[in-house]
Amino acid sequence: MNATENFQIIHRYLARQHVLTLCTATGDDVWCANCFYVFNADEIAFWFMTELHTRHGEMMQVNPQVAGTIAGQIRHIAQIKGIQFKGEVIRLEGEKDKVARARYCRRFPVSIAVKTPIWQLNLNEIKMTDNTLGFGKKICWQR
């Protein structure tokens, strides 16, 4: 497969999922949190909401370098698909916030009522495991 075909496989998977595990770190402290997300294929980024005062929110303000995973709960090993990623987060403001928030609220209507900050996680590296393409098949992408 070429790079375009690889990215299309990753894109399809990310567009069908909706929860990521976000891993943050500052100094010798690490923390993970599950967040609902929308995949922005144009910027190869995730949009997600989280408060500034959460443990991971505070850590992202100190160190915007993050990593994480996306995985379904598959019972059969031959069907395993999942993503490992790393990237950098920024808190959105102004017009970018409005655009991301509108799309996020369309996907998750319950979020319309909250004023939680919205963040963009710019993906720098993705590694996907897709056992439906062959046991242990890896598809990699880098910015």
Swiss-Prot record:
Disulfide bonds: none annotated. Belongs to the UPF0306 family. NCBIfam families: PRK03467.1. This is UPF0306 protein plu4501. It comes from Photorhabdus laumondii subsp. laumondii (strain DSM 15139 / CIP 105565 / TT01) (Photorhabdus luminescens subsp. laumondii).
